[in-house]
Amino acid sequence: MSVQWTDEQQRAIDARGGHILVSAAAGSGKTAVLVERLTQRVINQEDPLTADRILVATFTNAAAKEMKTRVIEAIEAKIKVAPDDLYLKKQRQMMNRAQITTIHSFCLSILRENYYRIGLDPAFRIAEEAELLLLQDDVLEEVFESFYASADPAFYELIDSYTSDRDDQAMLTLISNLYRFSRSLPDPEAFYDHLIAQYDQPIDPDESSLLTRLFELEWERVGPVINRYMELSYRLRQSGYDEMADLLVQDVTPVRRINPEQDRWTTVALAFQAVEFGRWKGIRGDEEMKKFQTERTRLVSDLKKMRDLFVEKDGVDYLEDLRSQLGHVEMIVTLVRSFSAAYLEAKQQRGIVDFSDLEHFALAILEENGEPTDVARLLQERFIEVLVDEYQDTNEVQERILRLVSKSDEATGNLFMVGDVKQSIYKFRHAEPGLFLNKFKRFQQTEVGTRIDLTKNFRSRLEVLDGTNHIFRQVMDEAVGEIDYDEAAYLRLGNLGYVDSTQVDPELLLVDQTDTNKEELEAQVIATRIIEMVNDENPYLVFDAKQKRFRKCEYRDIVILVRSRGKRVQALVDVFEQYELPVYADTTGGYFQATEIQIMMSLLKTIDNPLQDIPFASVLRSPIFGLTDRDLGRIRAKSKDGSFYEAAILVAKEQTPLGLRVDEALNQLHHWRTEARGKSLASLIRSLFDQTGYFEYVGCLNGGRSRQANLNALYERAHQYEASGYRGLYRFLRLIHRLVERGEDFSEARSLGEDEDVVRIMTIHQSKGLEFPVTIVSQLGKQFNKQDQIQAIQLHKTYGIALDAIDPVKRLRSGTLLKEVIRREMDREMKAEEMRVLYVAMTRAKEKLILVGAIKGLEDQLIKWQDQPLDELLLPEMDRRNAKTYADWVVPAVLRNFLLSEDGPRWSFRIIALDEIAPYQELTKMVEQLEHVRVLEKIDHAGDETLNIQIEAAFAYQYPYQVATDTAAKQTVTELKRTEQLERAAFESTHRQSTYYRTPQFLGPTLTGAERGTVLHLAMQLYESGRSFEEQILDWEQAERISSLEAQTMREAIPELTTFLASDTGQLFEQRLLAGEVYRELPFTYKIDSARFRSDWHGPSDQAVMQGIVDCLIRDGDTYILLDYKSDQVFETTDNQNQAEVLRTRYATQLNLYQEALEAILHIRISRKLIYAFALHEVIEIY
């Protein structure tokens, strides 16, 4: 069945003559239209055009391949209908030569054919990123060394002004960043000249283009404030507060006289200097007046900040400060030019180019002195049509190249551009949406070009489209989003195949952040909503277009979109695992954070230099050597001042189990250091895998294949590093450090495939071009990233480089005029980009759109968000400009949904209470995460080791709550139990002394009673059902999970251990262990009133945080049994029954507290509390 194209789509397919811009909204079938246009051009025999005379430029190899494949398939389908058509067969063959390619590949083809024109070695290759990073570092260091050697005063003054006392890394980074930034522009040399010119402004405020621009940018903020002032004044007058209304008018009268079209800086500054704020005369008890006063206070604060810009510093001072930094900028330009030339020479010597070179070398071949070369003119003749996909993502260099190979006259040209400026989200790659916007506005006048708008969306339900339109028509316009979201931009329903449903309204879910971890709380809200959608009782129904019916929502239908990677994605993954929800985190990155990579990197760092404490200790603690935290503490205790390596050497000299193990580790490290000097890096890494057995070890862990893939990737990266001509472990480690420093990463291998029934997590950027039945947009409460705006040195393509003004005598720095301009420009551009990112995220949804945010101080924020005027469609410009999060745009727009129109777009809005968040699906997963439990109510000083308030004798009174000063805010259960026992002991006046003495250490290694108890606990923790203790102890010892001394202690205690297993409780333990219903060594944190464990507490109600570790929890039907192991002796009596009673009394408090904490945290019921006393070989029940 043939495709039924809309009128706009057909126009885009058929349009000829002149440059054509197709503005294709999300889901409008852009790719299908482009493929159809291509297909029609090559199969049309009335207007013959061979496939090799079309250039199609894309941004990814995948897009180019898909487009070429689809055109070929379309031609082959025509051939099946007309098998004897020679023209079609010829076109099919010509498709192999068609230039459907990425811009970089097209540039590469120009270089391969014309390398001799620019003196390029024909054997050049495209270098790996790692090789380029190392080369850049080497060249930069050489350039800086040469300047240090030259003793140039200007260079030394620059270094002294803008680097720290420790090193010059800040300036090295600046030169590197400035170089990369300049390469996104067609003429880097002209840009360097522009940098200098910006600091050479005339000292005349009214003639300075920078001061004029600063005023324009500030007026964008002042204008809306004045409007809010006048609107508030009007409401005051309507309410009968004429005097206060006049006061507001008086506040802004001087600035209302400013004519932003004509007035210059001096006039504007005088107007702001005349601003004075009169005294507000409130009326006691008048609540309406209080609200007006609060609004006015906020407006006064905003206007004062704006006034300060014009009053605190004179225009002449701004310009003189700028001029004072001219010498510094000239030196920076000298440095970057020196680096650029040296780096180019170094690449030529190695016969390599980078992707930036591909574009600039192609540009040099195509253009000379601003005019097209013979090569460019030949290409203009060759290509009858030049099509550009995703035009909104081009940069200025790429735009220049495309213009040079196409016909230049816009009215008669042959450039066909497709894209959507509302989806331009690659500014970090120097994409320039202004190129699209410029044509978007000009091409409305058809004589200079043709603009075709594709507004029908064939992806989404009407509810999704209406919900998206409802938000963006209120927040996006040219002032804030760089484009008006008007009728022409509205998403319109194109897919009429959806069947009506009552479940499809878009949702906004907000939760109050309180003091809970924001990422984890938000993840729990999302997990709870997904559980609701996929449950069997009342599932969300997805419409199956192929079967024309609804079906139950599956995990694979759902995507969660995040703004950025890192801990936020990990929080989602962790919570989903706790809820036992299948999840696939489709993220590039996390490789260097993977445990197995961190351990191997620590090992390589230690081999390179064992004096690095953290890597060395990490390796000792890792499974490679298997030392414990206690072992590391003993090593550090040997030498508190020296390095950890030096302390280890001292321990290795001791004839103790620890000394022997440390000695063995040091010998092994020495062997590997020797090996490193004689082997290639890749061979060394492979040898480490083999010798340590670590490769096989990680293969046995969860996700073993992925972990092994990560290790193999490290080996391959080392191999590539050496293939680039570099050698040495130190340089490899420096390369990895640079990659991490720049935020670059490798892809972490994943064991779960994309096609499986899992919830997907991906960044919004990764989702671009994709679609999903259910789209959950998270992180609405995440603050926008303003790092670029707070850097000490800032870069901007129009305004250059912003430096602080430095007073060399006073050693003071202050902001400059350029910094004020660039910071404001960057903020405008960032807000527009973030608005486009949000648009991309929301338009991924086919059937269900859910927005989620954890908001700090939600109640106060809601009061602010709902206080919006209803007389205009757009939200106030000032509020939109001041937005710090997506929620600042989305929530006010959604709230107005309930006020503007009864029949408007349907948004479901819910505030999620903490008790609505679903409990974890299985106790197992909850238990594994108990260490992450957070008390939701804030407890001051809960993290202190002790909370002792020292009362000096000088105070003349007795502090009434002295007991509180002796009580730690964080108590272990053992400490609580000990407190009770001490009080009871004091009451009974009982004094006992053990007749058992510890064997002196010089008589041989032995364990204290407490250490022996720890070993027995460890045995019960490691025990696996179905095998004897003898076998398992041998395995643990051979695997170095326990020391030989610990193994000996366990063997001696086998009778005590097996007696427990033979008991009724032990048999239940074995049964439940096989069923996976025994939970061991469970850490927890719980809040408790201090008075509960201090009988002499007479202070105010106060709380402490209790910490403990539960030895064992056994599921028994619908309840649980709490089991604790005790190895201590009872000396008060020799009668077993009496001894049991002593232990029961001794530990009743502890187990009662355990029960209370676990029942509160896990929402379970504990039916029995038991002690197994190893010394008595007896199970004792606590009542």
UniProtKB/Swiss-Prot annotation:
Keywords: ATP-binding, DNA damage, DNA repair, DNA-binding, Exonuclease, Helicase, Hydrolase, Isomerase, Nuclease, Nucleotide-binding. Residues 3-461 form the UvrD-like helicase ATP-binding domain. One of its GO terms (biological process) is double-strand break repair via homologous recombination. It comes from the Bacteria. Its EC number is 3.1.-.-, 5.6.2.4. Its cofactor is Mg(2+). It catalyses: Couples ATP hydrolysis with the unwinding of duplex DNA by translocating in the 3'-5' direction; ATP + H2O = ADP + phosphate + H(+). GO terms for cellular component: cytosol; DNA helicase complex. Pfam families: PDDEXK_1, UvrD-helicase, UvrD_C. The heterodimer acts as both an ATP-dependent DNA helicase and an ATP-dependent, dual-direction single-stranded exonuclease. Recognizes the chi site generating a DNA molecule suitable for the initiation of homologous recombination. The AddA nuclease domain is required for chi fragment generation; this subunit has the helicase and 3' -> 5' nuclease activities. This is ATP-dependent helicase/nuclease subunit A. It comes from Exiguobacterium sibiricum (strain DSM 17290 / CCUG 55495 / CIP 109462 / JCM 13490 / 255-15). The lineage of its organism: Bacteria, Bacillati, Bacillota, Bacilli, Bacillales. The gene is addA.
